[in-house]
Regions:
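Generic N-terminal targeting/processing segments that precede catalytic cores or assembly contacts
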Residues: 1-358
């Protein structure tokens, strides 16, 4: 199934935007792992709406664990959690019942499912499905942290404004935990304020903006992953593209490598405390599909939120006539902001899956 992921742990997300709940099933977690539910809630709060620069829709997003967790520890059985959808307004989508929203999955989903799919809030294509992903990511991060592996992300670009990038060789440098407690997820607060200003301007204009999320993973040894189709990049990318709105991904120097010479792009090896490292990290922590022991650094690009208030051209699928559409509902003027913990969660689940297969 397309909603399943993983080789050593099996992750399944389920539900729809305006269904009674969304949820996650995780199979293969080691037994006896301590899981702090309050830390999970801290993670979930980073994704919540209700802020000036996000959707007004705000859910509590408190997971209900149905099985797999007992006395604060994993039992070794499949772990299942659901998150109730309480703040829903299907009436916002009545005028779009037969009119596909531009750049949403409405039309191809209509063709695939013959119109039987739930289109309220995007149904199974909604960003609401990232809530259960964040539950899985929060659990994965706690397990990884005990192995000395840490994951963090920030909004590196939005509306043409750039944040300070991670140091590719030492991305943590004391900022990982700070990022996870910030209301707006940038390293540079001044850049964050400029981004917020631009996002609010777009919102006021009934428009939206895109952005880029940068993610880093530290503490991984060399040799994880597989060559060719099982590469570490492939596995991370597959998971990241499961987040709605992602348009591209790059590792290390990424597409700028195309403009470099080999002498500039190559990362010379060195010894640090008798451990093989590289002087630079243009490869982003992965070479030949295998982790190199350097931090994994990647960036995911998000398109502007397609749900905008401006009139847009579309087609009535019942009458097969062109029409104009004005989208109602509650939407993010920049989905990249709330996607930061989602990217982090996706990376954490993927890395845990690789680590457990070592």
């Amino acid at each position: 199934m397309s909603s399943e992921y993983g080789q050593n742990i099996k992750l399944t997300v389920f539900g729809e935007s305006h269904a009674s709940a969304v949820g996650v099933l995780i199979e293969g977690l080691p037994a006896g792992e301590a899981i702090d539910e309050e830390r999970i809630m801290n993670f979930m709060r980073r994704r919540m709406g209700g802020k000036a620069w996000s959707t007004p829709r705000k859910e509590e997003d408190r997971p209900e664990f149905l099985c797999g967790l007992l006395g604060g520890k994993t039992t070794g059985a499949a772990l299942c959690a659901i998150i109730r959808n309480s703040n829903i307004r299907p009436s916002d989508y009545e005028n779009m019942k037969n009119v596909p929203r531009p750049s949403h999955a409405d039309y191809p989903a209509f063709v695939k499912y013959g119109g039987a799919n739930d289109r309220s809030g995007g149904g199974q294509f909604s960003g609401r499905l990232t809530a259960p992903l964040c539950v899985a990511g929060a659990i994965s991060e706690q397990i990884l942290a005990r192995k000395g592996i840490n994951v963090a992300a920030h909004l590196s670009r939005a509306a043409g404004i750039d944040d300070t990038p991670f140091d590719p060789c030492d991305p943590d440098n004391g900022i990982f935990e700070k990022l996870k407690t910030k209301l707006f997820p940038t390293i540079d607060d001044t850049a964050g304020e400029e981004m917020i200003k631009k996002i609010l301007e777009a919102k006021e204009s009934l428009d939206s903006v895109g952005g880029i999320v940068e993610c880093a993973v530290t503490g991984l040894g060399a040799g994880l992953g597989d060559p060719i189709f099982g590469s570490a990049e492939s596995r991370i990318s597959s998971m990241i593209f499961g987040i709605g709105g992602v348009r591209g991904i790059e590792f290390g120097a990424g597409f700028s490598a195309a403009d470099m010479t080999g002498s500039v792009h190559n990362d010379p090896y060195c010894l640090i405390d008798s451990t093989v490292k590289t002087v630079t990290n243009n490869h982003g922590g992965i070479i030949g599909g295998l982790t190199s022991g350097m931090p994994i650094i990647f960036r995911a690009a998000f398109k502007p939120t397609p749900s905008i208030g401006l009139p847009q051209r579309s087609v009535d699928l019942d009458s097969l006539e062109e029409t104009r559409l004005e989208i109602r509902g509650r939407h993010d003027p920049c989905i990249a902001v709330r996607a930061v913990p989602c990217v982090e969660a996706a990376a954490a689940v993927t890395v845990l899956d690789m680590v457990l297969g070592k």
